[in-house]
Amino acid sequence: MKILKLEDFTIGNEEPMTLMGGVNVLESESVVMTVAEKFAKTTSNLNINWIFKGSFDKANRSSISSFRGPGLDEGLRMLEKVKSEFNTPVITDIHEPSQADSVSKVCDVIQIPAFLCRQTDLVIAAAKTKKIIQFKKPQFLSAPEMKNVIEKCRQAGNENITLCERGNSFGYNTLVSDLRALPIMPKFGFPIVCDATHSVQQPGGMGEKSGGQREFVPYLARAAIAVG
């Protein structure tokens, strides 16, 4: 099993737990810093490794009028401030190959969104940064199919990989968590992450925006921790 080194801690299925938490999309700087401060205090009290997560652009939106984020430059500025003030690694996602280099200069982990993880040019561009690359398993792929995604990254010269379970499509506007993915994907030899919040998303479930069933998040998170 691959063990990844990040700042002053390690990431691996047999290593102490790492929490990736922050905001879904970077909003105002005040919101970002308030949330980061809360995470910093809580994870410090619980002695949990923490990586701040925030997206500078949410390109995959239901409506043209939906808020997407502050954009690349402003988003990276916010992430750099969080990283500096709270001494924590940061993760964000990219949507285009051209974003990989700029993001790699600030972020410790680059995330490839679920709908984009089969985009070969994007995967290769991210891999070439040599950063840790987190692949969110698409709602339309089975756990065994993630082997193909991994191989693209490895062929580009990067084996710093994590795989993130985030639910599977179950009819219209509904995701379900197939927790069999948690013992299946480690067989590829890389650390596994569970996104308990996006796993309860209801894509497009509110017409012009997505809904969700947040009341189930704690149960999925506990189940994932129990699996290890």
Regions found by a protein language model. Name each.
Residues 46, 105-106, 156, 227:
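Structural motif
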Residues 37-46, 65-91, 126-132, 182-194, ...:
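Alpha-helix-loop-beta-strand connector modules within alpha/beta enzyme cores
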Residues 78-81, 100, 120, 124-127, ...:
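Active-site loop-to-helix "anion-binding N-cap" substructures in soluble metabolic enzymes
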Residues 70-71, 85-99, 108-121, 132-143, ...:
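Catalytic beta/alpha-barrel core
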Residues 129-228:
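Catalytic alpha/beta core domains of metabolic enzymes, predominantly
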Residues 23-32, 50-72:
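Glycine-rich, proline-tolerant flexible connector loops at the mouths of alpha/beta enzymes
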Residues 1-19, 77:
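N-terminal amphipathic alpha-helix/helix-capping segment at the start of soluble metabolic enzymes
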